[in-house]
Amino acid sequence: MQNQLVVKRLGRRDYLPVWQAMHEFTDTRNEETPDEVWLVEHNPVFTQGQAGKAEHLLNTGDIPVVQSDRGGQVTYHGPGQLVAYFLINLRRKKLGVRDLVTTIENLVINTLKAYNIDSAARPDAPGVYVEGRKICSLGLRIRKGCSFHGLALNVNMDLSPFLRINPCGYQGMEMVQVSELGGPKDIALVEQQLVKELVNLLGYEQVEFSTEAEVREA
């Protein structure tokens, strides 16, 4: 199972049921369980990471705030943003946490390069940036040697809710998205490229695609 990856497309979902399903998957997986990547668009929500501080919630208005157990601080999820959750057995892949963070950042950088968008990681703030503007947020959690949570890549969305917070705890952090930089507006195209780059970076030999997932709507 080391080189098998299951990719699940969940469509548009509320945050909490997916969060709960990630926990259940991680708690019940064993050494034979294949790694999975879940691709999803969330309904509008602010999520506070474990390092989140209330003062970074400026004016959340009618958008709910959910406490999450991922790393990092506050961010926004909404339609038009590609969220990818990485349910990977790090021990089996012989990856450290820092290795995984670097792999995910390179995954996004390579994906954007396919659309002639030059981007880079920053040593002081996880994520991926284009000329100082943030295009991808990153937050992970490790349990029993396995990762969950993942990345949020802005593709073709309403960015204005980011003005209601200090994204990832940075006051005035400017956000940008793929469609503004000449890339596709279609999330499905970006998903395909992202999965292709992930398979290349982590050496999966067998990839199975699914639109089904055990995610119960609340």
Swiss-Prot record:
Its EC number is 2.3.1.181. GO terms for cellular component: cytoplasm. GO terms for biological process: protein modification process. Residues 31-206 form the BPL/LPL catalytic domain. InterPro entries: aa-tRNA-synth_II/BPL/LPL, BPL_LPL_catalytic, Octanoyltransferase, Octanoyltransferase_CS. Signal peptide: none annotated. GO terms for molecular function: lipoyl(octanoyl) transferase activity. This is Octanoyltransferase. It comes from Vibrio vulnificus (strain CMCP6).
